[in-house]
Amino acid sequence: MLAKIGAYLHTLPSPKPPGSSFTRSFPTSITRESIGSILNLHFYVPRDFDEQRQRGKRYPVVVNLHGGGFTLGTPTDDARWARMVLQELDAIFVSVEYSLAPEHPYPAAVEDGVEALLHLAVEADELGIDPTKMGLSGFSAGGNLAFTIPMKLYTYLEASDKKAVNQRSTISRIGSTAIPRVVSIVSWYPILDYTISRDLRRTNSRRPEKTLPSFLTNLFDQSYLPSRDEIHSPFVSPANAPDHLLVNALPHDIAMYVCEWDMLYEEGTRFANRLEGLGKRVDCTSIEGKPHAFDKSPNPFSVDPQVDMLYRAACVILRRGFHGEGPSESLI
């Protein structure tokens, strides 16, 4: 309830965040376990989208994953970010309503993200999307998904054991022209390494009193990962992914935003340095004097002007991936 109140207060300051333009729902189909569930995608599109789509225009797309510890949050939480994307980029913004724990623990959210990318690629002509120009963005838990989803998609596409993938799935139907190409990632204050305890993170943080409370982080972690057996998986802890997976599955252009007072600050900077060492073009911004989810402050009277500045800077990274020079896409 408190999370819902905070999210509502976040929508009050001017300029008002936009509502989604339309929602598209489709049945999931990748794994046998997920068959029959419905996934919703919330679209934010440019004003002249319908006219331009009918003329054959194909837009880049930013696929967004909201935060909330894999247990809370809605696909409209990042509407202010969507507004900036529409303002700064000639692109479509799609927010994924992925499955939440504890009803749907790992790997449901990751698989939903893969489903979303494949659906957008397969239906690209109808939706006015250029499937070769996809950007991923995510906040907190969604920042984790922005890395784990392309890695999971890569392993699905590369899998030699087709028994692991439902033969009626979207993967079995795609051709080379429908394979989604992720060209950039923007990850905001992501959780990246579940092998590190929350207590250790909190102790090592610069302002422990500013970090999320234990009761909340325990709820998040126990809901998403009821068993600790998966904490070393790269699809849970991307910081533990092998080099070859990071090199092949992730795009060249990556932006990360880490908050100085966040317990996730250290693992974020370490991961950014590792990616840079692997040859990725990484823009890692340290946001001084700010806690986790600083941009979602429930202040009903104003929005921190730094938020718009950072959102606008993130759009530069996305634009570089969509239209820039040099190698910028993952190998999936």
Protein language model regions, located:
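Alpha/beta-hydrolase superfamily serine-hydrolase fold, recognizing
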Residues: P17, F26-I332
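An N-terminal hydrophobic leader/cap segment in hydrolases
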Residues: M1-E33
